[in-house]
């Protein structure tokens, strides 16, 4: 059984991943995979360099991630181009990791932030969605990423609205409360999962 885990930016998904890992389940992290491929010499690093030129690099040759983020989130056209350029490479690499882990584990998770936006739904037996109100999401994003309200709003607006994701979720994990509430909900879901398998 493969479970897709998703949620909007600053929804608390990373905390959910830690709880799942603590329960002994393996989690493929799409963000980490992207990060690894964006290091100097990686597949995405080269694709981004070919697209945007060396203005996105730091003096040491590494990607200037804040500048890259600002560029990509600056317009819908840039986001679309980024998805086109990086999407195919990311899908290939995630599929390879998924197929490899499926040989070793009966049940595992894949943490994919843009699961619905990039049409990964058919990869999964279940989809767990971490949900948070736009107000809480905005506050957390501004605090975590040191963004202005406008920048946070642009990033949130670039993702599919929560209401459109809800019908596709097997499980919705409400994370508008505190960390203890979240742990209780996730541990309950994991217990239910263990009874299913």
From Swiss-Prot:
Pfam families: CoaE (PF01121). Gene3D superfamilies: P-loop containing nucleotide triphosphate hydrolases (3.40.50.300). Its EC number is 2.7.1.24. The keyword DNA repair does not apply. Its main location: cytoplasm. It is an enzyme of class 2 (transferase). It comes from the Bacteria. It is found in: Cytoplasm. Pathway: Cofactor biosynthesis; coenzyme A biosynthesis; CoA from (R)-pantothenate: step 5/5. One of its GO terms (cellular component) is cytoplasm. Residues 2-197 form the DPCK domain. SUPFAM superfamilies: P-loop containing nucleoside triphosphate hydrolases. GO terms for molecular function: ATP binding; dephospho-CoA kinase activity. It catalyses: 3'-dephospho-CoA + ATP = ADP + CoA + H(+). The keyword ATP-binding applies. ATP binds at residues 10-15. GO terms for biological process: coenzyme A biosynthetic process. Keywords: ATP-binding, Coenzyme A biosynthesis, Cytoplasm, Kinase, Nucleotide-binding, Transferase. Signal peptide: none annotated. Belongs to the CoaE family. Catalyzes the phosphorylation of the 3'-hydroxyl group of dephosphocoenzyme A to form coenzyme A. NCBIfam families: dephospho-CoA kinase. This is Dephospho-CoA kinase. It comes from Streptococcus thermophilus (strain ATCC BAA-250 / LMG 18311).
